[in-house]
Amino acid sequence: MAKGLDCGTGNYVACLSDKVKTQRNAFITIDQSMNTKKSLKRLNIPYVEINNKLHVIGKAAFEYAQVFGNVALRRPMADGLLNPKERDALPVLRSIIYELLGEPETPGERVIYCVPGTPIDKDTMVDYHESVLQSLIDGLGYSSRAINEAEALAYTGLVDNNLTGIAISFGAGMCNVGIFYGGMTAKAFSVSRGGDF
């Protein structure tokens, strides 16, 4: 059975055979102590440990940042792509992806993941972003393949129109646009402004 993964700036969403799981794409850093670690484990709060610091990930990070106020909510992605200013982005993303996908049901199980189109208003490295995500997913024992986000939307939203029309995704980091005719992509691109702008 294959799985789907939408890798968004605001949320990561996994489509599994029996359910859809969502995790906020954010984290906070807290000091490590035995009591803190035990509390996180007891409350089943996802975290990753990097350089003697605990990074609480996902929805729990957002909630803690709201409650404590003086804790900075950080994001491993910005403007629809990997955040180049966030050095802990990769281990955090690996944890978010693992929490959503879990272990493969069979070795090399297929995961299709979304990537943005090339921005028309900014010079960015979409290929690098795609390669890093593939490495993170494949590193968990999956066999992954990228799909343009607008194309993925077209496969669900344009089915009744013979896959002909326009698909637009308004994400937190960018907007993805695709123009399709009879299932073929006439044009696909992104604009590097989204809901966080």
Regions found by a protein language model. Name each.
Residues 173:
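Glycine-rich SAM-binding Motif I of class I
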Residues 176-178:
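A structural feature that tracks compact, well-ordered secondary-structure segments
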